[in-house]
Amino acid sequence: MRALKIWGMTMVVVIAVLGLYIYQNNREYQIILLNTNDSHGSILPVDSVGGMAERATFIRMVREKNPYVLLVDAGDINTGQAISNRADAKPDILAYNYMGYDAVTVGNHEFDKPLNVLLKQMQWAEFPFVTSNIQRNGTPLGVEYLIKEIGGVKIGIFGLTTKNTENVSIHAGEVTFENEVMAARKVVKLLKKQQVNLIIGLVHLGFTESAPGFITSYRLAQEVDGIDILVDGHSHSFIERPEHIHKTTIVTANQSGRYVGE
């Protein structure tokens, strides 16, 4: 728990298992963090589980109970069902627009097709792609970071993609990838200068190494101070409860839209 001075009044923010609790003016508010990752073109249910319609229904039900919701995704929207693949994931992007995603990062499978496809997806999207360690012609591919204000709380959001994408994705050579730890330290410093109250990283790194020596979300939490929450993707890990490394909470939601983290 930590006390924060916002607009001249004291606000206490607590990171708990199921959300961010705010105590303000003797009232308790909760900011719900909903997270997905590695959707992989799962427009329709996989083995009768998930699908965009089911996901949208769940998100709507959560929002009906609490208006303070932050909805994010940790990458790999692309490459899965034929209905998505043949349309360059446009159905997925439109579904994300409908569900009201606040921010998405880029996964390695976003580079399975030429870069112009990803650029089209960014144009279709009504949400930002946060790409703190990917550059194109010397500038961030998407946005370097994002600040969302919810319930009077300033939330800084950054995004990272595994540098191993350079080795496993055929079109990754059209952009450059910065070391994940170096990029995270830099963007956390920038967000602190903006006086955000919480810092969330959308990281397509994985709980386990995709290749020897590459950065995982665990290692990032160990090596970079100042990150409150890491929303992870890439390794398709399933964990029922958040992991806590030092002062950082790590969450992930398996794959293919089977789960929505809350």
Predicted regions and their residues:
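Core hydrophobic alpha-helical membrane-spanning segments
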Residues: 12-20
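Acidic, metal/ion-coordinating pockets
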Residues: 8, 20-262
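N-terminal Sec-pathway targeting helices
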Residues: 1-13
